[in-house]
Regions:
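Extended beta-strand/beta-hairpin segments
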Residues: 1-70, 82-162
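Alpha-helical metal-binding/catalytic segments enriched in His/Glu/Asp
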Residues: 72-76
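Conserved phosphate/anionic-ligand binding catalytic regions in large, soluble enzymes, centered on
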Residues: 79
Length: 162
């Protein structure tokens, strides 16, 4: 750890997305900037998203809401593992299940009073570890994705008409 170079801890992650049809999209993750340099994945990660048929998709892939829950679960489990290791805490297993509630009245434009996205997310974690319950709570709260979802952050949208 070089505390004299705080910029080494600043990262920028990138993804590009192409809409294909109806609820079907293809997202590519090619690289990121961090630790003072650019990184490229040896092969871009290609992620497909779709909506279930009841939401006018074809049900060929997880939907965007599923990916939000997936990102949260993966980040929380990884954060527990990394921070436990840094503190010398043994973790044998982490299992996470999540539920997110959405009222589509907002998304469908049927109500301006209902949010368009998740109204709440419940995370249940089973962690086999020698840590105390208080330590496990602290470890789970280190997740950057959980922090992002808990805070209201600006999302800047740039639109280029073609």
């Amino acid at each position: 750890r070089d505390r004299g170079k705080p910029d080494l801890a600043k990262f920028t992650f990138r993804a590009s997305n192409k809409w294909l049809t109806c609820g079907n999209n293809q997202t590519s993750v090619k690289g990121f900037y961090g630790a003072g340099q650019e990184f490229s994945h040896p092969k871009p990660f290609e992620l497909e998203a779709d909506e279930p048929e009841v939401l006018l998709g074809e049900g060929k892939a997880p939907g965007p809401a599923d990916y939000v829950l997936t990102a949260l679960a993966a980040c929380m489990a990884t954060s527990v593992s990394y921070h436990a290791a840094a503190k010398g805490i043994n973790v044998e297993s982490v299992e996470t299940s999540l539920e997110g509630d959405i009222d589509l009245h907002g998304f469908l434009g049927l109500s301006t009073e209902v949010p368009k996205g998740f109204q709440n997310i419940t995370v249940s974690m089973k962690i086999k570890s020698d840590a105390t319950a208080e330590q496990l709570e602290e470890l789970a709260n280190m997740s950057p994705v959980a922090d992002t979802l808990k805070r209201a952050i600006p999302v800047k949208v740039n639109i280029e008409k073609q």
